[in-house]
Amino acid sequence: AIAHPLISHSEPLDGVTLKDFRILASETTQASDIHVPPDYFVCEDCLTELDDPQNRRYRYPFINCTQCGPRYTLIEALPYDRANTSMASFELCPECLKEYSDISNRRFHAEPVACGRCGPQLLFSQAGHEIADNEAALAACVTALREGQVVAVKGVGGYHLMCNAADPATVQRLRAHKRRPHKPLALMFPLSDGLAALSRVVTLSAEETALLRKPGRRIVMATEKSGNGRPQGISPGQGEVGVMLPYSPLHHLLLNDFGGPLVATSANISGEPVLTENTSVEQS
């Protein structure tokens, strides 16, 4: 669980009978010790729902709950309430509102809670024109990657440039666009095959595997294997390559549908800030 009580003051109350528990609206009229929550990688419960055809959030790329999902990235003002986030314009449908209001539900007061009916939708654009949405958008993205295109994917915190790691020519085009001719790139691998694709490319110790699966979804340096399965041009002359697992439900779906490793690097020219706005990516 990511929820931990932080009690700054307590006071015993004698003769008081408590009948229920409520989360009241935040007060903004007085200063207080406010903590900004970080973004969290998608949890196992949400991954299970994401892959369950019987679940109403099946393959919904923005699934989240109180244990996972974006926080810091969504905040426009404090305190951290839905009305102060970029989710404010998405009115909850009756089913999501019921979950949000139910203290026994793991989405109780999960501020970014949403579903395919009431939440953000997935779009695929080319040259500033929307080509497809939702499942068709995901399929179009996978097709573009398989055809050797470099794709900008909007994740939590900003855009990634992604391409087929097994296509050296495409990797070089990505390097040229990013103006990063030699520095190592990182690879993102699917989870659906039990890390089989990962084990074909690198050798991982038990400790490195554990680090890879930790909540931070960090990049782990691993020893490259020799042979035909080794991607070319990823970390020239290093003998090691940075590997990571999908951290968001969108990346989870994309990597699983693609079925192999993708180069994943921030969508900015080396040394410049990460791109977060759609218009900035379209102009770059």
Roles of regions detected by a PLM:
Residues A1-I2, M221:
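Short basic, glycine-rich beta-strand/loop surfaces that mediate nucleic-acid
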Residues I2-R22:
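Conserved short beta-strand edge segments in small beta-sheet-based binding/regulatory domains
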Residues R22-S284:
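Active-site-adjacent structural elements in enzyme catalytic cores
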